Swiss-Prot record:
The keyword Metal-binding applies. Keywords: Calcium, Metal-binding, Repeat. GO terms for molecular function: calcium ion binding. GO terms for cellular component: troponin complex. It holds the Pfam family EF-hand_7. Residues 55-90, 96-131 form the EF-hand domain. Ca(2+) 2 binds at D109, D113, E120. This is Parvalbumin-like EF-hand-containing protein. GO terms for biological process: skeletal muscle contraction. The gene is PVALEF. It comes from Homo sapiens (Human).
């Protein structure tokens, strides 16, 4: 059975280390969906809006810890792949492709070591360097 939009948005938020209530889901802009697929860039922007500036650093820290599955202090390709594996490929959301995930790592990886540390991750979120979905 396919999950509804609300369930998938809650999973996405959990994967990012935060959560969305049913009320938050209702407040999501309708333009976040385009031709039945999900607009990740608008989702990330909206999540940042849900957290007041005083809460943004905490939200980023929580999201980083959630994504850093092995607690190495880095988000690595295998951890990105894990997140991709828990996002359903059908329904109102479209998971990132391998190429889009690689583009995200490259956008954030300012040190060029193929992985994302906390500072790079924080900068990615704060500076909106998330690559656009094709």
């Amino acid at each position: 059975m396919e999950e509804d939009f609300s369930s998938q948005m809650k999973k996405m938020a959990l994967a990012m280390g935060t959560s969305l209530s049913d009320k938050d889901i209702e407040l999501l802009p309708t333009d976040m969906r385009h031709h039945g697929s999900f607009n990740y860039l608008k989702f990330f922007k909206h999540i940042r809006k849900l957290h007041a500036s005083g809460q943004l650093d905490d939200a980023i820290h929580t999201a980083f810890q959630s994504l850093d599955k092995d607690k190495s202090g880095f988000i690595e390709w295998n951890e990105i792949k894990y997140i991709l594996s828990i996002i359903p490929s059908s329904g109102p959301t479209t998971p990132l492709t391998d190429e889009e995930a690689e583009a995200m790592i490259q956008a954030a990886d300012t040190h060029g070591d193929g992985r994302i540390n906390y500072e790079e991750f924080s900068e990615l979120i704060k500076k909106e360097k998330i690559p656009k979905k094709k």
